[in-house]
Amino acid sequence: MGTDTASPDTRPYHVMRRIFEEGFATGDTSVVDELCSPGLVEHQFGLAATGAQAREHVKAAIRDVHRAVPDIWFCIEDFAEQGDKIWVRVRARGTATGPFFGPPSNKPIDITVFDLARVADGRIVEHWGVPDRFALLAQTGQLDRLAR
């Protein structure tokens, strides 16, 4: 049986957990500099870019999420790792007390996010993210507003 020599803090699961808990949940963008490679390749719709621009897009997303839902918390409900890749299914909950495609709704949100990341040396080098934006729009009442 092989021995895993990777430090617990650099394993893909721990890197992903930290980006959610220390970044998105708190609004602290400094975690991006620590956990995302300078050459990050970001594929997520609305954030897609490479290098410094990709890292700035992730920082902006952290600020936007935290501004819209300051009490947000994340729970990794499922994950799978293969080589340097990790897939996670994350549950995000909170209250939309900040602006999100319109004025604050003050409604609770509970959405799922699927992420795939490639992690090397404790840093995210490539990322694909699929947050359930439709559920978010519906739960905050923005979908009804847009349908009018």
Regions inferred by a protein language model and the residue ranges of each:
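C-terminal and inter-domain tail/linker signature
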Residues: M1-R148
